[in-house]
Regions:
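Alpha-helical scaffold segments
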Residues: 2-238
Length: 238
């Protein structure tokens, strides 16, 4: 075993008088312990050393124990949102209660924990989900199957997800998101056509920047000449 590659300037040398062979040396350091079991397979004597590392504990469960639980490492795995989710998804294949507090600090892992593991809402993670426009929309549309008021402030920062939230979830106007929608000619036009089904004056300056969307807005919504600030943008042809 090449111990030198783990030396980082701070690592103390093991006392070779106390460690007569490779396995005994490996007990002193998580990296060495994991390297040993990678070569020799599961070893309960080295598990306490491995259980000091979040990543090491997860990889031990996945690759050494062949995707079987590693109870000794669960306490440290539970400190990480990423590895708690992965442990639930790939090892336990069910909820990991001990790790839910950590998962709930991260929007992405909270959403996927709800979607892939719980297959239902994850209230503990909603505060984190609500910080992200995309995951707030996806949580509303795919998990709650209805409005997610806590996430609407984040959703309203995005033209894309404000439009999708209005169209797919609310199935009607999303006033809070109209300012963002109005910055994008595509979503402003489609918001008028497919959501509110009437003129969307706030979005007209953006729509006017694109010929194709001006045509659609004129023909489908206005059904009259499209003027903006006294300037003809598109002539209605009937």
């Amino acid at each position: 075993m090449n111990l030198w590659k783990y030396y980082d300037g701070d690592l103390k040398y093991p006392d070779l008088n106390k460690h007569s062979h490779e396995k005994e040396i490996s007990k002193t350091n998580t990296k060495w312990a994991f390297e040993y079991v990678s070569k020799h397979g599961k070893d309960e004597d080295l598990e306490p050393a491995i259980a000091k590392s979040t990543k090491g504990s997860y990889y031990y469960a996945k690759y050494i124990l062949n995707a079987q639980p590693f109870p000794l490492g669960e306490k440290i795995i539970a400190k990480s949102a990423e590895y708690s989710y992965l442990y639930a998804a790939e090892i336990l294949k069910k909820s990991f209660k001990l790790g839910e507090k950590a998962i709930a600090t991260n929007a992405q892992y909270s959403f996927f924990y709800a979607k892939n593991i719980l297959k239902k809402p994850f209230p503990l993670g909603e505060k984190a989900i609500a910080t992200d426009a995309q995951y707030s929309y996806m949580y509303a549309n795919g998990i709650l199957n209805g409005p997610f008021p806590l996430g609407e402030k984040a959703i309203a920062t995005s033209a894309e997800f404000s439009y999708l939230y209005a169209h797919d979830v609310l199935k009607g106007a999303f006033k809070l998101g109209e300012k963002a929608i109005a910055t994008d000619y595509h979503y402003a036009c489609y918001y008028a056509i497919y959501v509110i089904k009437t003129s969307f004056e706030l979005g007209e300056p953006a729509i006017a920047k694109d010929a194709l969307h001006s045509l659609r807005y004129t023909d489908i919504i206005l059904k009259k000449d499209f003027y903006l600030d006294g300037k003809l943008i598109y002539k209605y042809k009937g």
